[in-house]
From Swiss-Prot:
Protein name, per record: Serine/threonine-protein kinase 33
GO terms for cellular component: manchette; nucleus; perinuclear region of cytoplasm
Subcellular location: Cytoplasm; Cytoplasm, Cytoskeleton; Cytoplasm, Perinuclear region
Gene: STK33
Gene Ontology molecular-function annotations: ATP binding; protein serine kinase activity; protein serine/threonine kinase activity
Swiss-Prot/TrEMBL GO biological process terms: manchette assembly; mitotic DNA damage checkpoint signaling; protein autophosphorylation; spermatogenesis
Database matches in InterPro entries: Kinase-like_dom_sf, Prot_kinase_dom, Protein_kinase_ATP_BS, Ser/Thr_kinase_AS
Ranges annotated as biased composition (Polar residues): 449-468
Species this protein is from: Homo sapiens
Regulation: Specifically inhibited by CDD-2807 ((3-([1,1'-Biphenyl]-2-ylethynyl)-1H-indazol-5-yl)(2,6-diazaspiro[3.5]nonan-2-yl)methanone).
SMART domains reported in the protein's UniProt record: S_TKc
UniProt-annotated catalytic positions: 238 (proton acceptor)
Lineage: Eukaryota, Metazoa, Chordata, Craniata, Vertebrata
């Protein structure tokens, strides 16, 4: 094309009669094997929406100058790499830290064949196909998902666009990486990292089931990915074994397999527009993985993903789903009940801690399920019993009590067995016989305490007892007991009780009855 055409709104090529628009790079299809490139869009990971940018006019002029001084025989080889230079040199994998994913619009799919060599088919869908492809220049292998937009229809195309936007916005070691996107009027090509070991479900089918250690590694990676998504207000909504790909695997010294997994298929994923938009309504997902609140058509939150993690974990350990039925209606009934069973012999080798995690993941009430962040901190994953963060508010304490009543009972038993300060005081005998000049009998003290309570009622008997015991002198106490009393924090109830000054000298000697 003539250089003067760059300064006009549009012009026609004398060889192919194709029109080019201002600020849009076009390559003559009659002179090269590459269809015209229309628009290059750039997307930032800091935003779900994609920011579009056109190739600058200065760069086009520079390319035209280079093209003019180049011989005719060299023209095809240079122009055939226009997309490659734009995507790989400026926005390639090496520059991924800048958070840019190129979205290149082209006339047809021939341009992609100039960049990639297509290989085996990795998977098929109702209106799409996934093919292994090798970059001709770098020899890097990728998985290209090709979707026929015409067959998919408008609703499916919207889901595809949402999936693309979400993949452009995320970056996590256990979430599939989107390298770039090519789009024609009829098709869309997603170039993603290749997971050569295939789906996690295929590996499970071959093994039968995983050991507890093997499952722990997988769940830790999965929980990390889901915690990242939830922290960014993204709900996957279709977690299942088929949507967990295996990038690579490693056999350790114990002959156990360690899998590097990637969460994929964000077709049903949704990003909440704000923190206040906590609940979702649409019923979606795969039945055996669906949470009770989803199948009941109730409002639900990101906790539906937690239930799905529980189903995945159960299947990894057992080799089959936690709920099986002859019909979908009966299946949903079992899911609503949420009763887990561990009668099979395979569970004999599984620790109680792992079973406890399953129960916490698959609580019927989503409010009582642990979160992805709490799962990451669970001692079953960390191996550290002290790693779990203690609850900081009443709701969290109530949830912990519901999830781990045994541990709460153990803590309560320990506290009961631990001698209290009052018991130490009772057993303590001071050196020698030190007479108390103001000594009064127990009956007299009881009468005085009752009279005081009537005159100055406290909020509870416990508060009154705390108030009374707080007046006990520590002058004659041994250092151990004295230090313990000084370290004891003053609770709000104690503060309330001490508002009322003692009007009787005998009150200062009142003891808490044991």
């Amino acid at each position: 094309m003539a250089d003067s055409g760059l300064d006009k709104k549009s012009t026609k090529c004398p060889d192919c009669s194709s029109a080019s628009q201002k600020d849009v790079l076009c390559v003559c299809s009659s002179k090269t094997r590459v269809p015209p490139v229309l628009v290059v869009e750039m997307s930032q990971t800091s935003s779900i929406g994609s920011a579009e940018s056109l190739i600058s006019l200065e760069r086009k002029k520079e390319k035209n100058i280079n093209r003019d001084i180049t011989s005719r025989k060299d023209l095809p080889s240079r122009t055939s790499n226009v997309e490659r230079k734009a995507s790989q040199q400026q926005w390639g994998r090496g520059n991924f830290t800048e958070g840019k994913v190129p979205h290149i619009r082209i006339e047809n799919g021939a341009a992609i064949e100039e960049i990639y060599t297509f290989g085996r088919i990795l998977g098929k869908g109702s209106f799409g196909i996934v093919i292994e492809a090798t970059d001709k220049e770098t020899e890097t292998k990728w998985a290209i998902k090709k979707v026929n937009k015409e067959k998919a229809g408008s609703s499916a195309v919207k889901l595809l666009e949402r999936e693309v936007n979400i993949l452009k916005s995320v970056k996590h070691e256990h979430i599939i990486h989107l390298e770039q996107v090519f789009e024609t009027p009829k098709k869309m090509y997603l170039v993603m990292e290749l997971c050569e070991d295939g789906e996690l479900k295929e590996i499970l089918d071959r093994k039968g089931h995983f050991s507890e250690n093997e499952t722990r590694w997988i769940i830790q990676s999965l929980a990390s990915a889901i915690a990242y998504l939830h922290n960014n207000d993204i709900v996957h909504r279709d977690l299942k074994l088929e949507n967990i790909m295996v990038k690579s695997s490693l056999i350790d010294d114990n002959n156990e397999i360690n899998l590097n997994i990637k969460v994929t298929d964000f077709g049903l994923a949704v990003k909440k527009q704000s923190r206040s938009e906590a609940m979702l309504q649409a019923t979606c997902g795969t039945p055996i993985y669906m949470a009770p609140e989803v199948i009941s058509a109730h409002d639900y939150s990101q906790q539906c993903d937690i239930w799905s993690i529980g189903v995945v974990m159960y299947m990894l350990l057992r080799g089959e789903p936690p709920f099986l039925a002859s019909s979908e209606e009966k299946l949903f009934e079992l899911i609503r009940k949420g009763e887990l069973h561990f009668e099979n012999a395979v569970w004999n080798s599984i620790s109680d801690c792992a079973k406890s995690v399953l129960k916490q993941l698959m609580k019927v009430d989503p409010a009582h399920r642990i979160t992805a962040k709490e799962l990451l901190d669970n001692q079953w994953l960390t191996g550290n019993k002290l790693s779990s963060v203690r609850p900081t508010n009443v709701l969290e304490m109530m949830k912990e009590w519901k999830n781990n009543p045994e541990s709460v009972e153990e803590n309560t038993t320990e506290e009961k067995n631990k001698p209290s300060t009052e018991e130490k005081l009772k057993s303590y005998q001071p050196w020698g016989n030190v007479p108390d000049a103001n000594y009064t009998s127990d009956e007299e003290e009881e009468k005085q305490s009752t009279a005081y309570e009537k005159q100055f009622p406290a909020t509870s008997k416990d508060n009154f007892d705390m108030c009374s015991s707080s007046f006990t002198s520590s002058k004659l106490l041994p250092a151990e007991i004295k230090g313990e009393m000084e370290k004891t924090p003053v609770t709000p109830s104690q503060g309330t009780a001490t508002k009322y000054p003692a009007k009787s000298g005998a009150l200062s000697r009142t003891k808490k009855k044991l």
